[in-house]
């Protein structure tokens, strides 16, 4: 029997014992060594050869991942580990660290109960570290910490024991500060800060495959002094044999991460809003393998042979081939064609996957990342909204007309697999739009279309996604229908930042119970009466119906909302989406007869009125901005800060960290296109940098007209603004 | 001068003599057929009949951009044609007021319209009609099935013993339909039978003004299964019946005794 087969059988045996299962994710800032660590764990579990661990990057299965040396997709793997005499089944997801692929991290967190946060000892906690810790804690996932690249402190930086200790404690302190900030207000979480004494922190070198923790030191007798000696004298092989990284980390995983039985009762109320007293809730809390089947899909992948594969966490019941399951948000049922678990990049089919595990399923053709799949209709899980939104768009066209249908299908597939990608199909022009998190994100996705699907495509220059927002409150505006028999009286006000933030985070929506929605809005500062009159939430705008007892308005309301939706999707300045508007309907006069107040009358009346009210409310263009952090040797600091300032950016802070200078600031995404090559040449390639999308900002008045005209021209709109626009 | 001329109910012969003379005397002739049309003829036949050129305006060309009509009326004699009467049901009073605003003289030449035919053909007395209403196609309004305002109107009329004239939806050049769509009386009866009351009495008037005009009275449920031939149709939901009305429905509309 092959070794691999043996492991699969071992996994299958353990799958039925939730106490022995740990579902974990490895998450970190880009280049802090997640994937190398994952290889170590795989080698330790006998899944890949010891010799190649560290170079093989078994999890980076896509060609482009190996080329770029970064992880792009979250990848799944299962392995076994013996701890204190018991075998444990460890289901692990390796996640991308680059900020452009943050959506994958968010989705992975839904499937796991523990997050192994990896931090580079030299660089310390970085912006992306903060983001992943935040993502984990928001999902109720418990963190532990592995500080990687300690070998560099010893060999490269020649640090002594005291300096090293100081540096490591400061990394731990930074991570704990994040954890405390996020968990303070959660009463269901005891102290989740990590510490060396508790054994929730480990150190080591994923490259040289050694690691230590307090429990390992007690067991092996190896202390920091011994490690420094061996590392300095280049006896890394010995170090690895005496205190192998995989054992240290996997012991920590088995000891400190909750098993599904401990985790699910706490996590279910955070991620699922259904009836807590229902049978299905009980079955999920108990991880009942005999209960109703509930699978939360966190990832959709494509296998050249098996087709589309849905991966996700089984919260209840047992998945088997042949089951007919409901997929949330779609009608009818899908039939499970096969079930399996992951081993490295490969899927192993098994007979069944019980509650508490991460499963790979084929046949769920309607599922997308985020779907709830179950054998009886149920309240779906909270949507896994990744908080950052598309900021860059590119047009994409097939070079050969014959490829057009295939391209459309592929684009739809891409957006199904990666919900942070959004697609706009235009069948008339054949020029489709693909929007994502950043230049790299779009570049990777378009290359994959060319390479994996063999469709030659032409892509346009990257374009930034803009928005429009009111910057004051309007006077009452009258909207008149074309037949002049219907009139609507509306105003536009600015939504408060707090309310807008709640909408942005998905904390308030029309899907939630009315009472709950009112409470969230009131807590965010909306007055009570207004919060009671919310008629709809349209994009990131709220529509308030302030009218009382107008005959026939109820059967016209849907059309009013249609008109509002039209006007808010295409704002009056440049047909970019409007956000942050509170639209209030004060009064309406309607024709007696339904036919004279149909869509052709009501939609234009309300659409026009909203646009005029928005203009009266001093609507302005918003542009996306990014936080920028550059680490650079001091001699290049001037050039680096110049690169930020020269891009309409602002440098907020410059300080020394170790032997490098750090430049922190913000700049518009539009100006950051092409930043990589410019900063490289400006600093002779000595800078490392990180950018993170930081929301939208009102553009300076002296640029408004110029940019609006550029967008209008690009969209083939008239290049003149309504005369009533005089506020910039 | 802007003269509003009703073309009557069915074909080029339905117009009044006064209307015909006004068309003959006009410098420009405009028309709209988006609210209703003459089923028994078309624009070319009308043009031939009146020996003139008809400029057809769409909805936007009347409601949003009426300037060409008004300019022609300011400079000379213009007529504006619609099927039926120009001021009943589809009211073009807005266009008339815009003309008045510009100091243009206006006049109205009436013609038979669905409302008079409904009373005329069914024998239901025009004194005893309440508010009228239009039944839209289910996809064309903002609610499901039948809009509440339609059934509310019928019920409010019936409480006072009054009949309800139900106009049936017409969609001309609508993006949702190929060609033109006319709701049939059986579709209307079916909608009301399903969403309101299948046992209530209904009276169908098909092709009013045409040589083969048809009238049928029965329960809505039964009317839903019948076929009344080509358009246009309309439906009346009677309130209480005067004895002459009852006799008329039996004699002229074939109402079964148990439905009255």
Swiss-Prot record, chain A:
Keywords per UniProt: Cytoplasm, Elongation factor, GTP-binding, Nucleotide-binding, Protein biosynthesis
Cell compartments where the protein resides: Cytoplasm
Residues with Diphthamide modification: 596
Domain (tr-type G): residue spans on this chain: 19-261
GO cellular component, as recorded: cytosol; ribonucleoprotein complex
Cross-referenced InterPro entries: EFG_II (IPR041095), EFG_III/V (IPR035647), EFG_V-like (IPR000640), EFTu-like_2 (IPR004161), G_TR_CS (IPR031157), P-loop_NTPase (IPR027417), Ribosomal_Su5_D2-typ_SF (IPR020568), Ribsml_uS5_D2-typ_fold_subgr (IPR014721)
GO molecular function, one term: GTP binding
Keyword RNA-binding: no
Pfam family, one: EFG_III
SMART domains: EFG_C (SM00838), EFG_IV (SM00889)
UniProt: GTP binding residues: 28-35, 94-98, 148-151
Entry's Gene Ontology BP terms: translational elongation
Keyword Transmembrane helix: no
Main location: cytoplasm
Function: Catalyzes the GTP-dependent ribosomal translocation step during translation elongation. During this step, the ribosome changes from the pre-translocational (PRE) to the post-translocational (POST) state as the newly formed A-site-bound peptidyl-tRNA and P-site-bound deacylated tRNA move to the P and E sites, respectively. Catalyzes the coordinated movement of the two tRNA molecules, the mRNA and conformational changes in the ribosome.
HAMAP family per the UniProt record, alphabetical: EF_G_EF_2_A
Family of this protein: Belongs to the TRAFAC class translation factor GTPase superfamily. Classic translation factor GTPase family. EF-G/EF-2 subfamily.
Protein name: Elongation factor 2
Organism: Halobacterium salinarum (strain ATCC 700922 / JCM 11081 / NRC-1)
Curated annotation (Swiss-Prot), chain B:
Pathway involvement of the protein, from the record: Protein modification; peptidyl-diphthamide biosynthesis
Any GO BP: methylation
Catalytic activity: 2-[(3S)-amino-3-carboxypropyl]-L-histidyl-[translation elongation factor 2] + 3 S-adenosyl-L-methionine = diphthine-[translation elongation factor 2] + 3 S-adenosyl-L-homocysteine + 3 H(+)
Tagged with keyword ATP-binding: no
Disulfide bonds: none
Top-level EC class: transferase
InterPro entries, alphabetized: 4pyrrol_Mease, 4pyrrol_Methylase_sf, 4pyrrole_Mease_sub1, 4pyrrole_Mease_sub2, Dphthn_synthase
UniProt keyword annotations, A-Z: Methyltransferase, S-adenosyl-L-methionine, Transferase
Stored PANTHER family: DIPHTHINE METHYL ESTER SYNTHASE (PTHR10882:SF0), DIPHTHINE SYNTHASE (PTHR10882)
Role played: S-adenosyl-L-methionine-dependent methyltransferase that catalyzes the trimethylation of the amino group of the modified target histidine residue in translation elongation factor 2 (EF-2), to form an intermediate called diphthine. The three successive methylation reactions represent the second step of diphthamide biosynthesis.
Assembly and binders: Homodimer.
UniProt protein name: Diphthine synthase
This protein's encoding gene: dphB
């Amino acid at each position: 029997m092959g070794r691999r087969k043996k492991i699969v059988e071992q996994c299958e045996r353990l799958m039925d014992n939730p106490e022995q299962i740990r579902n974990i994710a490895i998450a970190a800032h880009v280049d802090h060594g997640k994937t190398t660590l994952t290889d170590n764990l795989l080698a330790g579990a006998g899944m890949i050869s010891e010799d190649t661990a560290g170079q093989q990057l078994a999890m980076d299965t896509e060609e482009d991942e190996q080329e770029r040396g970064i992880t792009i997709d979250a990848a799944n793997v299962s392995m076994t580990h013996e701890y204190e005499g018991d075998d444990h089944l460890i289901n692990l997801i390796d996640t991308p660290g680059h900020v452009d692929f943050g959506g994958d991290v968010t989705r992975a967190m839904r499937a796991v109960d523990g997050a192994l946060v990896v931090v580079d000892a030299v660089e310390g906690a970085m912006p992306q570290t903060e983001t992943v810790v935040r993502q984990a804690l928001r999902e109720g996932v418990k963190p532990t910490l592995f500080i990687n690249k300690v070998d560099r402190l010893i060999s490269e930086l020649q640090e002594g024991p005291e300096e090293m200790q100081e540096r490591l404690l400061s990394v731990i302190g930074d991570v704990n500060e994040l954890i405390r900030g996020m968990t303070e207000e959660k009463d269901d979480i005891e102290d989740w800060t990590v510490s060396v004494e508790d054994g929730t922190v480990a150190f080591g070198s994923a490259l040289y495959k050694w690691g230590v923790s307090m429990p390992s030191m007690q067991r092996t007798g190896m202390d920091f002094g011994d490690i420094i000696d061996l590392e300095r004298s280049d006896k890394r092989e010995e170090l690895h044999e005496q205190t192998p990284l995989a054992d240290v980390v996997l012991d920590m995983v088995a000891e400190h991460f909750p098993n599904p039985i401990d985790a699910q009762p706490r996590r279910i109320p955070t991620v699922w809003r259904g009836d807590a007293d229902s049978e299905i809730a009980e079955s999920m809390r108990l991880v009942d393998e005999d209960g109703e089947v509930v699978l939360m899909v966190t990832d959709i992948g494509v296998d050249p042979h098996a087709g589309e594969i849905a991966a996700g966490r089984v919260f209840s019941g047992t998945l088997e081939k042949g089951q007919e399951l409901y997929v949330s948000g779609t009608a009818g049922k899908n039939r499970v064609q096969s079930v399996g678990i992951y081993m490295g990049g490969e899927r192993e089919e098994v007979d069944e996957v019980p509650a508490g595990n991460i499963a790979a399923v084929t046949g769920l053709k309607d599922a997308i990342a985020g779907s709830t799949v179950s054998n009886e209709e149920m309240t779906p899980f909270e949507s896994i909204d990744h908080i950052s939104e598309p900021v860059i768009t590119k047009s994409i066209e097939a070079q050969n007309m014959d490829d057009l249908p295939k391209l459309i299908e592929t684009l739809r597939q891409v957006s199904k697999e990666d919900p942070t990608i959004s697609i706009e199909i235009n069948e008339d022009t054949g020029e489709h739009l693909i929007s994502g998190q950043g230049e790299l994100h779009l570049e990777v996705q378009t290359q994959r279309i060319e390479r994996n699907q063999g469709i030659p495509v032409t892509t346009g220059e990257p374009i930034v996604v803009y928005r429009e927002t009111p910057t004051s409150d309007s006077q009452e505006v009258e909207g008149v229908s074309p037949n002049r028999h219907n009139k609507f009286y509306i105003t536009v006000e600015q939504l408060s930042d707090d309310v807008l933030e709640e909408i942005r985070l998905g904390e308030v929506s029309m899907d939630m119970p009315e009472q709950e929605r009112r409470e969230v809005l009131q807590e965010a500062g909306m007055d009570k009466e207004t919060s009671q009159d919310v008629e709809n939430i349209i994009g990131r705008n709220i529509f308030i119906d302030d009218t009382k007892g107008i005959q026939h308005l109820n059967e016209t309301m849907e059309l009013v909302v249609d008109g509002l939706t039209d006007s808010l999707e295409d704002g009056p300045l440049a047909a970019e989406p409007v956000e942050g508007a509170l639209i209030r309907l004060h009064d309406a006069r309607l024709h007696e007869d339904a036919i004279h107040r149909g869509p052709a009358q009501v939609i234009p009346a309300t659409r026009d009125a909203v646009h005029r009210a928005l203009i009266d409310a001093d609507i302005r263009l918003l542009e996306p901005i990014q936080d920028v952090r550059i680490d650079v040797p001091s001699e290049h600091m001037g050039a680096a800060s110049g690169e930020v300032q020269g891009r309409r950016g602002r440098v907020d802070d410059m300080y020394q960290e170790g032997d490098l200078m750090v430049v922190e600031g913000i700049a518009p995404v539009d100006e950051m296109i092409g930043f990589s090559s410019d900063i490289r040449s400006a600093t002779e390639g000595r800078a490392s940098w990180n950018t993170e999308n930081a929301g939208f900002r009102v553009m300076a008045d002296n640029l408004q007209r110029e940019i609006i005209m550029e967008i209008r021209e690009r969209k083939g709109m008239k290049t003149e603004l309504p005369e009533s626009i005089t506020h910039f | 001068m802007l003269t509003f001329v009703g073309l009557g109910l069915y074909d080029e012969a339905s117009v009044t003599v006064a209307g015909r003379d006004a068309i003959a005397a006009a410098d420009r002739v405009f028309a709209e057929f988006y609210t209703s049309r003459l089923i028994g003829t078309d624009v070319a036949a009308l043009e031939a009949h009146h020996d003139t050129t008809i400029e057809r305006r769409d909805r936007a060309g009347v409601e949003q951009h009426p300037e060409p009509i008004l300019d022609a009326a300011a400079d000379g004699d213009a007529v504006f044609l619609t099927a039926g009467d120009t001021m009943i049901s589809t009211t073009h009073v807005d266009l008339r007021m815009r003309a008045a605003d510009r100091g243009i003289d206006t006049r109205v030449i009436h013609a038979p319209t669905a409302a008079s035919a409904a009373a005329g053909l069914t024998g239901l007395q025009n004194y005893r009609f309440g508010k009228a209403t239009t039944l839209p196609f289910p996809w064309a309004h903002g609610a499901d099935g039948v809009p509440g305002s339609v059934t509310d109107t019928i019920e409010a009329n019936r409480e006072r013993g009054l009949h309800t004239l139900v106009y049936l939806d017409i969609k001309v050049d609508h993006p949702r339909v190929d060609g033109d769509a006319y709701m049939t009386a059986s579709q209307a009866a079916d909608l009301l039978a399903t969403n309101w009351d299948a046992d209530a009495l209904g009276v169908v008037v098909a092709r009013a003004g045409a040589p083969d005009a048809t009238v049928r009275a029965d329960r809505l449920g039964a009317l839903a299964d019948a076929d009344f031939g080509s358009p246009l149709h309309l439906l009346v939901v009677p309130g209480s019946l005067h004895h002459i009305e009852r006799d008329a429905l039996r004699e002229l509309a074939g109402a079964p005794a148990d439905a009255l």
